[in-house]
Amino acid sequence: MAIYSQVPWTLPRYKFEVKVHPLAATSNLQPDDGYKIELRAENTVDKYPAKQHARRVAAQIRQGLGLIFLMGQKSTLHEDSDQERSLRQRRYFFYLSGVDEADCDLTYDIKTDKLTLYVPDFDLRRAIWMGPTLERKAALRKFDVDEVNYHSALDEDVKKWAKNQDTGSTIYLLHGSQGPAENPPNVTIDSKALKLAMDACRVIKDEHEIQLIRRANDISAAAHLEILRGIKSMSNESHIEGSFLNTSVSLGAHKQAYQIIAASGSNAATLHYSKNNEPLKGRQFVCLDAGAEWNCYASDVTRTFPITHQWPSIEAKQIYQLVQEMQESCIALVKEGVRYLDLHFLAHSILIKGFLTLGIFKGGTLDEVKKSGASLLFFPHGLGHHIGLEVHDVSPQSIMAQGINDDSNNILILPTCVSPCTTSSPALISGMVITIEPGIYFSQLALDNAKPEQLKYIDMARVKNYMAVGGVRIEDDILVTKTGYENLTKVPKGDDMLEIIRQGKKGNDSPCVDRPTW
């Protein structure tokens, strides 16, 4: 049976129809088969729902009155240079505006339900050199706001608002340093409640946000497929990075959600390897962790693959299949109400059972090995994280919170485990988008610093046979639903992946995605 999925969605100005399918009539790919992603666009109007977001945040604050004040990212120069830094919009500002332009601010009057955007005043010299900035009428048409004023009116508007408020009214700031030029004397400044309220809202994605993440994933899928098709002609990690960037930009994604990781051989044992400059010759696997960004929303996709269309060694195949089992078993259990941490524990249990079978672990039961923490030497990070405006997106608690031991499972949760992979994280809720990204890594540094209670269960002679594997990670972006999940990542794995590599590029396969006509 041919694999076929059709996903229509709406983005600002365009409606896209996406089809991801192998061009085959049966489940077995044939030499002339291939994966193709089709993107078709038609004009529509669908603004980013900034006003809806503002109302949700205000409801979370629960104070009834007050003014939300948010500053956007300012234009800045590189140190000791006249060259501007690339804009990366402040994500909290974007959530309440949908504006990906520099030097803008906003206010939201909770009582009157009025969302006001402030755009830069016209600057003739800058317009001649850089092009015009946002004009008020154009901004009002483009963004989901009630009013647009020039930035020069901001301070006076805040003063006017304060004069009409009772003493003790509140201005809500994200940070104490990001407020009005002068704090009105009759109002209270609160720099704590707003972030907590926005984090609680951002963790549950609305339909518009889901479609943006879906779009980012489809562009990433196209880029990953292009690399699988061309990997046999690549000789350096830099070629992989360059190919991913080329496909992403050609499809309109000019920014990456994070720095590309194109790690071959033992480099894949470094979780966030980023040099991407070493030759591929003699390496067994490449671990490619790369995700495009679309309209400030991230994708996060990892695939591990050989340089050729065959498993490079029996050890490489064993580890890949074990990681794939870890991932597929965890994804299958995702639904509302599930505790994500239990999926993390499940992944460790599958790893331990697999290592006991392979002889990498020895001399203990599953529970004994688990209690020792030996599996953490090979799987040292959390199973995944939230994804949205940030690749490691926010949650109701700080994503940098210190981890805690869970005595019921005897698995140490490291500080690198972030929400929802902590003991204090709430159960999964419909509308969350999470990653499931188990990995197995053979890091000499980790093994050299292992504790005696961990080494007790490790057959180091056996481990040596696997060191050349480097590292294997497989990662998908998963939308939580009330009854299950939707996998937003459409990149082949396992044998399907090997078949794509074997087929290589044919004819006009580059790029492997039909560019939308916008």
Curated annotation (Swiss-Prot):
Q: Which domain of life is it from?
A: Eukaryota
Mind telling me what this protein is named? Probable Xaa-Pro aminopeptidase HCDG_07916
Q: Which organism is it from?
A: Ajellomyces capsulatus (strain H143) (Darling's disease fungus)
Q: Which cofactor does it need?
A: Mn(2+)
Positions of Mn(2+) 2 binding: 289, 300, 475
The answer to keyword Metal-binding applying to this record is yes
State the UniProt keywords alphabetically: Aminopeptidase, Hydrolase, Manganese, Metal-binding, Metalloprotease, Protease
First-level EC class: hydrolase
Its lineage reads: Eukaryota, Fungi, Dikarya, Ascomycota, Pezizomycotina
| Keyword Electron transport among record annotations | no
Matches recorded under Gene3D superfamilies:
Creatinase/methionine aminopeptidase superfamily, Creatinase/prolidase N-terminal domain
EC number of the protein: 3.4.11.9
